[in-house]
Amino acid sequence: MIIFTLRRILLLIVTLFLLTFVGFSLSYFTPHAPLQGASLWNAWVFWFNGLIHWDFGVSSINGQPIAEQLKEVFPATMELCILAFGFALIVGIPVGMIAGITRHKWQDNLINAIALLGFSIPVFWLALLLTLFCSLTLGWLPVSGRFDLLYEVKPITGFALIDAWLSDSPWRDEMIMSAIRHMILPVITLSVAPTTEVIRLMRISTIEVYDQNYVKAAATRGLSRFTILRRHVLHNALPPVIPRLGLQFSTMLTLAMITEMVFSWPGLGRWLINAIRQQDYAAISAGVMVCGSLVIIVNVISDILGAMANPLKHKEWYALR
């Protein structure tokens, strides 16, 4: 396990280093790039030194430090993605297991139909439908922002729920409820696609495990169905799914850009799209580096967690030697 972890960490370092060339190219080879006047080597050394010290330069649009802007928008996107990812796991894992143990029955067919429908709906269309019905027509939920305009929440961590909870305002409970109400529509919109994929992965894994002899032997010993599902099916069906969850998080980070634009969510995706519109290449380079690094780190962590849950995974390399 130690060798497997070290191998993944080395892969992480190499991949992040290669990613720096992508970010640097946006600051050097594009028209009106900030580093275009210097030689290639000197420009890369200067840019890489700034990257190490978390200095991405200043925006060509408003003159503000890009690092300060990232500190404001990055927590908003992470809060949205974490909540949506948690919702996808809470719903997708049990529903996928139900579909797996009831395969070819009406429960399985119904779950597959709903999952296929959710997977096929474009994110922007789903966001517009939820906005139309839940906000504009019924007036249940707000359509944009993170808080009501009545509340002024001091940014401490950048996470709306945590900042509202840490606030010493007498209206703290109302601030928390306002933050929750503003998150419901974006979280639902963002969680639909990964939820359907988790359902599909969990269904396939459950079917494979449910046909194993040790599951049938547990049933012949008189164990209850709940005990069999908890001890044998879930314990063995979940580890193969864990390494693939990193890809779902990466996909969700991409979908967050569209979600943030529709709901005017002040996050990294909306900030990056605005930078692309305004051709702010220094900001684009910083956004690409942050998003790419996050995707790589999450995938490596999911691989390591998958190997910890399934010891056979990190032995595959030795079996191929």
UniProtKB/Swiss-Prot annotation:
It is a multi-pass membrane protein. It holds the Pfam family BPD_transp_1. Disruption phenotype: Single mutation, decreased extracellular putrescine, in an sapBCDF operon deletion no change in resistance to antimicrobial peptide LL-37. Operon deletion has no effect on growth, but if the putrescine importer PuuP is also deleted then growth is slower. The keyword Transferase does not apply. InterPro entries: MetI-like (IPR000515), MetI-like_sf (IPR035906). GO terms for biological process: peptide transport; putrescine transport. It is found in: Cell inner membrane. The keyword Membrane applies. GO terms for molecular function: dipeptide transmembrane transporter activity; putrescine transmembrane transporter activity. Residues 30-80, 134-174, 270-280 are periplasmic. The chain crosses the membrane at residues 9-29, 81-101, 113-133, 175-195, 249-269, 281-301. Keywords: Cell inner membrane, Cell membrane, Membrane, Transmembrane, Transmembrane helix, Transport. Residues 74-302 form the ABC transmembrane type-1 domain. Residues 1-8, 102-112, 196-248, 302-321 are cytoplasmic. GO terms for cellular component: ATP-binding cassette (ABC) transporter complex, substrate-binding subunit-containing; membrane; plasma membrane. Part of a putrescine export transport system, does not play a role in resistance to antimicrobial peptides. Belongs to the binding-protein-dependent transport system permease family. OppBC subfamily. This is Putrescine export system permease protein SapB. It comes from Escherichia coli (strain K12).
